Amino acid sequence: MKNTIKIFSAIIYMAAILISSLSFGQMKQESKKTNSAVSASTLKTNMRKLWEDHVIWTRNVILCLVDELPGTDQSVKRLLQNQVDIGNAFKPYYGEEMGKKLTELLYVHINTSAEVVKAAKAGNTAAFDEANKRWYANSDEMSEFLCKANSNWVLADMKMMMEDHLKITTDEANQRIKKDYDADILAFDKINNEILVMADVFSEGIVKQFPEKFKTGGTKLASK
């Protein structure tokens, strides 16, 4: 279990280095891909898919860590890719640096969540409290970062939404650790519903901030 967590952290660290070392040319090429025009309804659908993937693959990793299942490395790799995908989804509106920073914050979110799960499984209250404190600090940092980018997102509401996400994730992991599988499933259903609300907050905020790029129906984004 200890080695699994170390591998988990190492993969995240290596992925962060890889992303930060992207050349300007690579980022330009990526930007062209992520700047493809979409309708407001497509943005909503895509944002929901990305964030739903976030909770699905987070759950998959939780199961791997708690139940010590094979395929943990593969699940971690897929979860990390989701954070890149989420960052990329924000780039057409906020630029390369913002999307990259969001991905980095999400990496910290995931890495710290693994520490929280590890401590909970081990029954190490001190380690759990320390990791949990950093987890919530990262959540607040992410909320502030996002709300600075878009005034349609209210900081107090964003912080509450992010904190609810952490609370439900913790409950999901704890129920799994206790082998209360019914409660575990209920927690996942709850976080799945919660993440769709979060995704809609993001897509609706983007449309409000950039109304000139969106029209109702299937109209495409206006070309720059």
Task: Identify the residue ranges that each predicted region occupies.
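Membrane-interface junctions
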Residues: 3, 92-96, 148-152
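Early exported N-terminus immediately downstream of N-terminal targeting peptides
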Residues: 51, 55-85, 90-91, 98-108, ...
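Mid-length scaffold segments of soluble, non-membrane domains
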Residues: 96-130, 135
